[in-house]
């Protein structure tokens, strides 16, 4: 649900979570930053109306006693119009003003269609017909409400498309219509959810009709005044927020962060991943079902497509390499396959045909073509100009050799009549590596030859890779420690991951602590454990499970230092937590350069890994060097290694001179060839600034006396 409001404005009212969004909009799933609160997501149980033809609904309303605005013929009957009747009585002098007092205005999809003497009774009749299935196949699409407040007396009937509606259990005379018999038939498959809607046991309400409803949260709250009962309270969450166990024990922003990070987790996105040719994709090698689950996980099919693994997690400061949200990973667990994944990248090219009978050619480019990359780049190509599957490749290696007609023909080529073709081969991106996984040769819609090459890269967790639990506790790997140096319990269990205890107090993610205890209890019990928000298994039961198996009910255990073999002072909180590997990996982001391309305008190094760019020295980094007095390093960094250029300055006027090729000498724009020009080494960006100032009529002068004295 995307708001059209401008992202640059505060719009506090639009961004805030409103009470009317209960059950329709997920309270957690919204992005951080400028879009917060403006991009919303639907809750788990909502239904968006598809709409029905309002003509038959309008005719039904007239049959139920609605007086049309003007006289009209409906199904063979002539109905006198509300306005026509008033005009006639006015003409006869019989209008007293009491005839239509208390009548309700009737709106159909926002359009005033007439008046009814008893709006409340009309609404009751429509609801009764809908619940009894007497309105036909479009009955469930109709919503009706009676708004009577002060001078307002309106009946609102909605049948249009795009309304967010949510299911509720109908309550009649203080008794919910959904019974245990219905539930048993649902479990056996004798009834479907749609059947319950047709039977009037469950009905979808839109925001207008919900204004007339008094909804009980739980069955024990139902009283004679209630009209509906909540179907399932966790249904207020969206799909991604529904996978958070013990969500009601977390601070709200943490659930919001997890709702965003769940979409970044690696897993098994499709069963046919070996045949698919996505532009890019990740695949977790050993995804596991979470031990601590919510009921929504089964509903959305998360167990069939999991996106994480169950880690043994200890809460410990350990070596200090896990400060500031870093985590320490067990290197031996990683060697055994923990959080191992594969990255797929697709490279595509097409052999196009052009007017005039010329076309591209897939082949190994000869050295004579324009833009030839050197023999080393084409070493991996076979005779057909395409790389073979299972070939190791790295940045710059050509995967598909292709030569094309040039975009522009020089005058010399045109005169001779020979056109030099140019190299348009597809090569592996700068800084990437991998193995050719699949080569697909086919044709596009226009009959051109189409080649797709998929490259895979094995991703083993390394320093800087990002991990997150299901409670918004994200962190990067700070250290990989061999198993023999990791702390271990009395049973010899070593944790897969060590998280810093300082990650918990200020963030108040109590849900992760509960999940750790529940995960341990689930492993001991041998079955997954329900942690659905508001309907979870009792924490006291979990403590009993731990106690029964000889563990402390608090989830703590004595642990030994793996390096010294000494017992650690104090007990360590250790358990099982479901962790997600996120697609932010250091191998996708790390880059450096010694030399490379520069920008055309400023002649400074390009920025960004994909452009073989350098790392920017910002203001704060420069200030550090200034503070250290590292003047030579400053000069090298800001000038020699960036955009050093030599200009010639007139010692009389301080203007930048230029070289006259015809005269073979340096010329000052003011003193012409009589001036003495001195060489000055500056940054090209500085020279550009001076020339831009000159273009605006400003006269900057460079004083070079100090250079002359030296």
Language model features with spans:
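Conduit-forming functional cores of very large proteins
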Residues: 1-710
């Amino acid at each position: 649900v995307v708001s059209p409001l401008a992202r640059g404005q505060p719009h506090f009212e639009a961004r805030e979570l409103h009470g009317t969004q209960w059950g329709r909009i997920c309270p957690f799933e919204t992005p951080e930053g400028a879009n917060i609160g403006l991009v919303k997501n639907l809750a788990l149980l909502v239904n968006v109306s598809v709409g029905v033809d309002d003509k038959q609904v309008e005719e039904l309303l007239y049959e139920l006693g609605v007086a049309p605005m003007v006289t009209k013929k409906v199904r063979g009957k002539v109905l006198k119009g509300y306005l026509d009747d008033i005009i006639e009585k006015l003409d006869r002098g019989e209008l007293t003003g009491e005839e239509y007092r208390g009548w309700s205005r009737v709106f159909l999809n926002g359009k005033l269609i007439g008046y009814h003497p008893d709006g409340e009774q009309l609404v009751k009749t429509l609801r009764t017909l809908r619940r009894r299935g007497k309105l036909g196949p479009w009955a469930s699409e109709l919503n009706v409400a009676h708004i009577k407040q002060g001078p307002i007396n309106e009946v609102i009937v909605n049948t249009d498309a795009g309304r967010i509606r949510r299911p509720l259990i109908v309550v009649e005379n203080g008794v919910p219509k959904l019974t245990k018999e219905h539930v048993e038939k649902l479990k056996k498959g004798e009834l479907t959810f749609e059947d319950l809607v047709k039977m009037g046991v469950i009905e979808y309400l839109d925001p207008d009709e919900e204004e007339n409803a008094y909804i009980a949260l739980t069955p024990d709250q139902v009283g004679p005044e209630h009209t509906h009962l909540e179907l399932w309270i966790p249904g207020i969450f969206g799909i991604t927020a529904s996978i958070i166990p013990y969500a009601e024990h977390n601070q709200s922003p943490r659930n919001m962060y997890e709702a965003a990070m769940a979409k970044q987790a690696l897993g098994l996105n499709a069963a046919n991943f070996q045949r698919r040719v996505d532009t890019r994709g990740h695949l977790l090698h050993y995804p596991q079902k979470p031990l601590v689950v919510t009921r929504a996980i089964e509903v959305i099919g998360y167990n069939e497509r999991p996106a994480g693994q169950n880690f043994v997690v200890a809460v410990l400061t350990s070596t200090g390499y896990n400060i500031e949200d870093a985590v320490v990973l067990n290197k031996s667990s990683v060697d055994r396959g923990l959080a191992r994944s594969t990255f797929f990248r697709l490279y595509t090219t097409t052999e196009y045909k052009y007017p005039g009978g010329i076309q591209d050619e897939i082949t190994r480019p000869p050295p004579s073509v324009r833009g030839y990359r050197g023999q080393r780049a084409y070493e991996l190509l076979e005779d057909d100009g395409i790389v073979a599957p299972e070939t190791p490749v790295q940045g710059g290696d050509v995967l598909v050799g292709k030569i094309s007609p040039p975009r522009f023909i020089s005058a010399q080529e045109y005169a001779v009549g020979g056109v030099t073709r140019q190299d348009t081969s597809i090569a592996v991106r700068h800084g990437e590596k991998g193995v050719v996984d699949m080569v697909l040769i086919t044709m596009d819609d226009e009959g051109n030859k189409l080649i797709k090459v998929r490259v895979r890269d094995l991703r083993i967790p390394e320093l800087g890779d990002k991990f997150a639990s299901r409670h918004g506790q994200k962190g990067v790997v700070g250290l990989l420690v061999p198993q023999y140096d990791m702390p271990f319990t009395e049973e010899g269990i070593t944790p897969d991951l060590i998280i810093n205890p300082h990650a918990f107090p200020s963030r108040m993610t109590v849900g992760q602590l509960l999940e750790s205890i529940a995960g341990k209890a689930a492993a001991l019990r041998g079955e997954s454990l329900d942690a659905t928000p508001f309907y979870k298994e009792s924490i006291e039961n979990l403590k009993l499970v731990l106690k029964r198996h000889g563990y402390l009910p608090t989830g703590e255990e004595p642990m030994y230092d793996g390096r010294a073999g000494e017992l650690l002072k104090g007990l360590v909180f250790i358990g099982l937590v479901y962790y997600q590997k996120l697609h932010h990996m250091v191998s996708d982001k790390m880059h450096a350069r010694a030399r490379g391309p520069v920008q055309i305008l400023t002649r400074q190094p390009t920025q960004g890994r994909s452009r073989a760019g350098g790392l920017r020295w910002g203001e704060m980094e420069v200030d550090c060097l200034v503070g250290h007095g590292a003047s030579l390093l400053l000069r090298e960094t800001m000038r020699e290694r960036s955009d050093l250029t030599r200009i010639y300055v007139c010692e009389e006027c301080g203007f930048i001179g230029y070289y006259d090729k015809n005269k073979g000498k340096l010329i000052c724009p003011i003193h012409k060839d009589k001036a003495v020009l001195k060489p000055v080494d500056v940054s090209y960006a500085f020279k550009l600034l001076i020339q831009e100032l000159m273009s605006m009529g400003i006269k900057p002068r460079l004083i070079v006396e100090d250079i002359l004295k030296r």
